[in-house]
Amino acid sequence: MKIRILCMFICTLLLSGCWDSENIEELSLVIGIGLDKPDDENLELTQQILVPKIISAKEGSSSDPTQLSITKGKTVHQMMRTSALKHKPTFSQHLRLILLSKSVIADQIGMDAIINQFVRDNGTRRSSYVFITNGRTKDIFNMNDEGEPASNVIYDLTENNKVTIRTMEPVTLGEISEHLTSDDSFLIPHVGKENGKLAINGASIIKNKLWHRDLTPIEVQNISLFSGTVEGGVIDLKRDGHLFSYEVYSSNRKIKTAYKDGKFKFTVTRNIEGRLSEDWNPNEDSFKDSYIKSIEKTVEKRVHETVTSFITEKLQKEIKADVTGLGNEVRIHYPQKWKKISRKWDDDYFSNAEIDYRVNVIVRDFGTKGANK
C-alpha cells in the first residue's frame, strides 16, 4: 500500500510540468554589452537586447530586432540593477560579446576591475568574446547589416581569422580573466567602422591591466606569423618588380627556449605550406622547380625581415610588452625562475631576450595555370 501511494505521489510530480518555465516572447535576451566612460565620475552601460516580440512583428523585414538600453552609474553591478528597473527581466545566457570603449581602460581603472562583475556573475558566459573600440560603444551597436544586429555581425566577423592573417583569433572573457590573474600582457581585437561597415581592424595591447597601445592589421599579421595559429590567409609580395600572392594553407611553429648568463634565448621556427595563387610576372613558369624555389625563397626572406623587424625593434625595444606567449614558454621550462621574474618579465627580460626567428616556406600548388606556352 505504501509503495502504491509513493508511486502515485511521484507520478503527480512528473505531471506538474516545468514549474519555472518562462514564455520566450516575454523575455529580453542580452546579446551584447558595451562599457563607456562618459565623464570622470561615471561609467555607462549599453545593452543590446534581442526582443522576441520584435522579431515576430518584423519577420521578413530588414529592421534590427533589438533595442538598446543605456544606463549610467559608478559600478557595473549598480548599472545592471538600474537597468533591470527599466525592462522586463533580461537574460545574459545568450551574451555573444562585451565591447569596451578604450576610454574605460586607458586611464586609472584597471581592466580587472571593469570585468570583475562579469567574471563573478554565474549568468554571464565566460565564452563571450571581448573587443575594444575607440569611440562610443552605442555607436557600434546602432549599426546593423540589413537587419542583422551589430553583436551578431561582429561575432560572425571573427570567423575571418581563418582566411586572413591580419585578423587575430577572438579572445574570450575567461581567457582575459586568466591573463589578468597572471599579470600578463595580451591582445584584444579592435572593432571599428570602415566605409560604413563594421570591421575588426587591428588590436589593442593590454599591459599592467590598462590599455597600452593599438596595433594596425599589418602589425597583427606580424604577430600572427610569429606566434599565432595561422589557418589561412594571403601574403602579397613582389619579385623582379612583379606582384604575386602566396596563399597560406597551413602553418605550425616550434619554439626552443634557453637561459644563459641572465638572458633568455628563443629560437622560433615557423613552417608554412601554401600555394602560388596569383602571379603578375608575364614570364613566369610555374612548371619549373627553379621558379617555384625562387618564389619560396622570396616569401621566406620577406616574412623573416618584416616579422623580425617588428618583434625586435618595435615590440621588444619600443612597446616592451610580450604578447607573443614567450613568457609562457619560460613558465613551462623554467618554473622556479619564472616565479622570481614574472612581474619584471616585460620590461627587464622580454625586452632584452635574444630572438632567432626562422621561416620555412613550401609551395604545394600553383593553381590550374602553369606556363602558357
From Swiss-Prot:
Q: Which UniProt keywords apply?
A: Cell membrane, Germination, Lipoprotein, Membrane, Palmitate, Signal
Name the InterPro entries for this protein. Spore_GerAC-like, Spore_GerAC-like_C, Spore_GerAC_C_sf
State the Gene Ontology BP annotations.
spore germination
| Lipid positions (N-palmitoyl cysteine) | 18
Cellular location(s): Cell membrane
User: Its gene?
Assistant: gerAC
Where does the signal sequence lie? 1-17
* S-diacylglycerol cysteine lipid attachment residues: 18
Ranges annotated as spanning the membrane = none
Q: Name one GO cellular component term.
A: plasma membrane
Q: How does it sit in the membrane?
A: Lipid-anchor
Main location per the UniProt record: membrane
For this entry, the protein name equals Spore germination protein A3
Function summary: Forms a complex at the inner spore membrane which acts as a receptor for L-alanine, thus is involved in the stimulation of germination in response to alanine. Can stimulate germination in the absence of GerD and GerK gene products (fructose and glucose receptors, respectively), but the response is improved in their presence.
> Mind telling me which NCBIfam families this protein's record contains?
spore_ger_x_C
Assigned protein family: Belongs to the GerABKC lipoprotein family.
